[in-house]
Amino acid sequence: MEKGMIKLKSTVILVLFALLYLLPLNGRWLWSPDETRYAEISREMLQRGDWIVPHLLDVRYFEKPVAGYWLNNISQWLLGHTNFSVRFASVFSTALSALLVFWLALLLWKNRRTALLAATIYLTSLLVYGIGTYSVLDPMVTLWMTAALFSHVLIQRATLTRERLMAWGLMGLACGMGFMTKGFLALALPVISVLPVALAQKRIKELLLFGPLAIVVAVLLSAPWALAVHAREADYWHYFFWIEHIQRFAEDDAQHNAPFWYYLPVLIVGTFPWLALLPGALRSGWAERKSSPERFLLLCWMVMPLLFFSIAKGKLLTYILPCFAPLALLMAAWISGLAPAVRDRLLRINSWLNLAFGSVLALAVAALGLGIIMPHLYQPGEGLTIVSGVVCFVGWVAFAAVSLKKSRSWGYLVAGCPLFLALLVGGSIPASVVDSKNPQTFIRSHQPLLEDSRYVLSDEVGLAAGLAWELKRSDITLFKARGELNYGLNYADAADRFVDEGAFPAWLAEKRRSGNVALVLKIDRDTDEEYRNLPAPDQLKKSHRYVLLFYKQIAP
């Protein structure tokens, strides 16, 4: 009976994973700038056959190392030129992280129910789901940080020198791959997480003795590529270390500057549909640090990165994704250890929180659709889009309501709360947002004109990357704004990849002699103010914030 229930729960989790993570993956447009950027970088890597130096729009792009791109490359190589392939590496990394969470729970507590619950909490947490189905590098670096956490547990449990060497070697492999995915950050997070555990358990000597092995392994793993990219591009490491790391995280003008408390609401919303478990799980990690040292270890791996990112001036909500694997383990362990009556009461509180959360969001979408708030977000004729958005959260409410049934196992049905959101969100985005963040629709609507253009320009890197991806050509020229390609455009061989607004009329007059020209703009407002002073086009196509100016070839 017990084995049968475990098999049933495992099957349900696999089906839920497929419905949440795989089925909707190809049905959503790529978001700009992140998804269009990573899609195009890997497309160009495959096209060029260059897996060493990343390029975007044929311009050097030094913002990240290459391991994340490699996973994206493999996905596109195996699965083709689709939105599914663009996002699959993120989903694959999230699935492997969930497997590590499952195995780690089994290792720590020898209980398959707790292990399944930990994996379920991880996969269905709102922030994990949102980032895990989105093409960015954070799910991949999270995979390696979860592997580093797993290695740390192996280190703690090792009794023989050989076991310690193996565990520290695995830590080095995980850190090395993390470094090759997102840089020095992947070395800092394990250090700040391991150190308080070593101090609390008086194992500093062991850390100093065996820790260098992890460093050596990480260096050996990353050295071939690090040396190869240096040989090809001598200033890669200067840019990557000083600009990408020091300026982004520490300086006053850091990119994505945000206050210290920024991650508190992100954490609260991101843990839905399991929010009620958060306070007790964190408290137990500290309160039971002596009786259950593994919980203190998990607490350190959750809290220390969170503090690190909170102190850093540059912040993005994706940064704290590595905190969710240890948090899911803490939650599963804590609720599994409660007395049945207390557990049932907690699950009911959790269900009510989800009921309130879903209701508020359903009402918010309805208010947006009716124009009560932000009256210009939805346009006339978008009734189905509004209904779809409301149903996303009505589904959340429905699962929360069903989970309120007075039966011990029903409380866990909140795991299904994100299901309707996952399946319907692609059809719930208002056209005004699609035509500012999802360039694929606009590009496909005017693909014949764009494909008939010898020269294609864009005033935003994310939009330009979307054009390159859809048209399968990397020679998109940037117009007026350099954006994140500013550094790469300073190279002499990239001088012709940017056209200033003042120089555009003369540039256009010259280029029109050899072919059609298409200029695609993303304007700030739904007016002609930003392009009225440009040379008059032969055709003008506009949809909300996207504008296409088409100039026909003229006789020489």
From Swiss-Prot:
Enzyme Commission number(s): 2.4.2.43
Keywords: Cell inner membrane, Cell membrane, Glycosyltransferase, Lipid A biosynthesis, Lipid biosynthesis, Lipid metabolism, Lipopolysaccharide biosynthesis, Membrane, Transferase, Transmembrane, Transmembrane helix
Keyword flag Nuclease: no
Pathway stated in the Swiss-Prot or TrEMBL entry: Lipopolysaccharide metabolism; 4-amino-4-deoxy-beta-L-arabinose-lipid A biosynthesis
Cellular compartments annotated: Cell inner membrane
Transmembrane segments: 5-25, 88-108, 116-136, 179-199, 207-227, 258-278, 296-316, 319-339, 355-375, 384-404, 410-430
Recorded catalytic activity of this chain's protein: 4-amino-4-deoxy-alpha-L-arabinopyranosyl di-trans,octa-cis-undecaprenyl phosphate + lipid IVA = lipid IIA + di-trans,octa-cis-undecaprenyl phosphate
GO CC list: plasma membrane
InterPro entries assigned: ArnT_tfrase, Glyco_trans_39/83, LipidA_mod_glycosyltrf_83
GO MF assignments: 4-amino-4-deoxy-L-arabinose transferase activity; mannosyltransferase activity
Keyword set includes NAD: no
Top-level taxon in the UniProt lineage: Bacteria
Family in the record: Belongs to the glycosyltransferase 83 family.
Task performed by this protein: Catalyzes the transfer of the L-Ara4N moiety of the glycolipid undecaprenyl phosphate-alpha-L-Ara4N to lipid A. The modified arabinose is attached to lipid A and is required for resistance to polymyxin and cationic antimicrobial peptides.
Protein name per the record: Undecaprenyl phosphate-alpha-4-amino-4-deoxy-L-arabinose arabinosyl transferase
Organism: Pectobacterium carotovorum subsp. carotovorum (strain PC1)
Gene: arnT
